[in-house]
UniProtKB/Swiss-Prot annotation:
Membrane topology type: Multi-pass membrane protein
Presence of keyword Electron transport: yes
Protein name in the entry: Cytochrome c oxidase subunit 2
UniProt-listed Enzyme Commission number(s): 7.1.1.9
GO term, biological process aspect, one: ATP synthesis coupled electron transport
PANTHER family per UniProt: CYTOCHROME C OXIDASE SUBUNIT 2, CYTOCHROME C OXIDASE, SUBUNIT II
Length: 227
């Protein structure tokens, strides 16, 4: 989860988030190099007073500043497209969970089980226990097995919502009348927090998401106790 004054991204929990962080570093380095070059040229012009008032045509320079930006854009676009395709791929999911957005809570249905469904509301501040997080705790967590591909089907009952868990690299719109899907795969156990990331009304800020990733054996015990 995020902390006050945090400058970096949250720790990656899924392969997709690891790829996104690598892509972020790759793109940031390109931006840093271009910015440094531009600032160096500007400072050089201001300090040396070098100008070329007589230059009317420079075919080589024009060729370079046409080809070079194209190469840079390709270097950014190719890794980005690769990650986009990875995010859309869902290979043999072991579990499917249907998520519905409401004003202002989430409901979950484990479609592989007959009667495993529940609503998930934010815990009011007055009901928090010591150590729990304000505006992030819920009464019913989404319990999922770790290290296994899980398909999330996401939609909405009323207005636009967005189901987002940053540490897993997830952000999928919940649109009324449309079923979107995403893949959840966690490399480690733990609690992972998210929130609705689409302004959906007066209580938009009070729609937290909590995923509890556990070993498969613990998940089987939990699901048996819930049915």
């Amino acid at each position: 989860m995020a902390y006050p004054l945090q400058l970096g991204l949250q720790d990656a929990t899924s392969p997709i988030m690891e790829e996104l962080m690598n892509f972020h570093d790759h793109t940031l380095m390109i931006v840093f190099l271009i910015s440094s070059l531009v600032l160096y040229i500007i400072s050089l012009m201001l300090t040396t007073k070098l100008t070329h008032t007589s230059t009317m045509d420079a075919q080589e320079v024009e060729t370079i500043w046409t080809i070079l930006p194209a190469v840079i854009l390709i270097m950014i676009a190719l890794p980005s497209l690769r990650i986009l395709y990875m995010m859309d791929e869902i290979n043999n999911p072991v579990l499917t969970v249907k998520t519905m957005g409401h004003q202002w809570y989430w409901s979950y249905e484990y479609t592989d089980y007959e009667d495993l469904c529940f609503d998930s509301y934010m815990v009011p501040t007055n009901d928090l226990k010591p150590g729990e997080l304000r505006l992030l705790e819920v009464d019913n967590r989404v319990v999922l097995p770790m290290e296994l591909p899980i398909r999330m089907l996401i939609s909405s009952e009323d207005v636009l919502h967005s189901w987002a868990v940053p540490s897993l690299g997830l952000k999928t719109d919940a649109i009324p009348g449309r079923l979107n899907q995403a893949t959840v795969t966690s490399n480690r156990p733990g609690l992972f927090y998210g929130q609705c990331s689409e302004i959906c009304g007066s209580n938009h800020s009070f729609m937290p998401i909590v995923l509890e990733m556990v070993p498969l054996k613990h998940f089987e015990n939990w699901s048996a106790s819930m049915i």
